[in-house]
Amino acid sequence: MTDPNPSAHIPHSPLGIEGIAAITYATDRWDEARRFLADWGLTPLADTPEQQLWETQNGAQVLVRRIDDPSLPPPMEPGPTLREVVWGVHDDATLNLLAKTLSSQRGYWVESYENNSIGANTRISALDPQGLRVVFRQSTKRALALQGSPSNPWGQIQRVDTPSPVYERAQPVEIGHVVFFTDRLAEMEAFYATLGFVTSDRYPGRGVFMRCAAQGGHHDLFLLQLPTGQVGLNHVAFTVRDIHEVFGGGLHMSRCGWKTQLGPGRHPISSAYFWYFENPCGGLIEYNADEDHLTDAWQAREFQPGPTVFAEWAIDGGIDGHTRRQPQVATSGGFLTEKR
């Protein structure tokens, strides 16, 4: 019988993993990918026939490689998809601990030893049970003096003599989380638990939300097991400053002609606002803001999958970036709340 909660029996290593430092896509939609990521709001760093390199505001990197690049591990699924996730760590001590933890795993590899010791340029990698290359290196993300717009909930006035912003487009702050379909949920959860990931919430036997440290955002990784046995990338989420930037980014992508999968909307489980688009690099891509922040006092909850659990509210098909209404709704000169 499969253990429904494998991580409960595995000690969580107190490792200093900071979050996602880089991801690598492989695609055969090369020029479309370049245009998409520019519209998405990433900063271009390099563009060669073999690789595109982009970054977020805090320096997290997005690499795009050719779909037949021999340096990449085999894909989890056909077509454009994610081939590698790089996690940033605090220091050499963390890398040494991870090297010991991963040394028995399939595909274990250490690059760039310095004087036979692990240093700042070292990459430690292995394949997770689904075959995704998981890499650890010292974090190169930058600290930022950014703040989202405060809100004025009842009884707690935080924004005075200042209007909320209206964004013309988004400029993602960081790579927030990755989500994969798996047919090995128990194995995958146990693998990441040994690396220090902590379970935040779960769909028993169906899915698990995990964060890379006890204190941090609701999840850095979500693993979802479907009845169909589908394997591969679901989506990558990019964190923006606030709900207003979710709207501004989504409306800009709409004006650029990109297709919404779902959104905007709000997830009850993490409290985050979202907007999902179809991505020529593979899977879906999400603007994400205002997720819950957890500590080691948090107790993981259990949910049964369902539409009201996934979304408190959501707009199917998005919002037209020109009319600011759902695409099938004609514009007029009246107020949206005007009686008809």
Which sequence ranges carry the predicted segments?
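Ordered, small/hydrophobic-rich secondary-structure cores
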Residues: L53-N116
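Core segments of cupin and vicinal oxygen chelate
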Residues: L15-Q61, S125, V179-H218
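Vicinal oxygen chelate
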Residues: M1-S13, E18-D28, A60, P74-Q171, V208-F209, ...
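Conserved active-site tyrosine of GNAT-family acetyltransferases
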Residues: A33-A38, G131, M188-Y192, M253, ...
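Residues at alpha-helix termini
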Residues: D39, S104-Q105, T194, R255
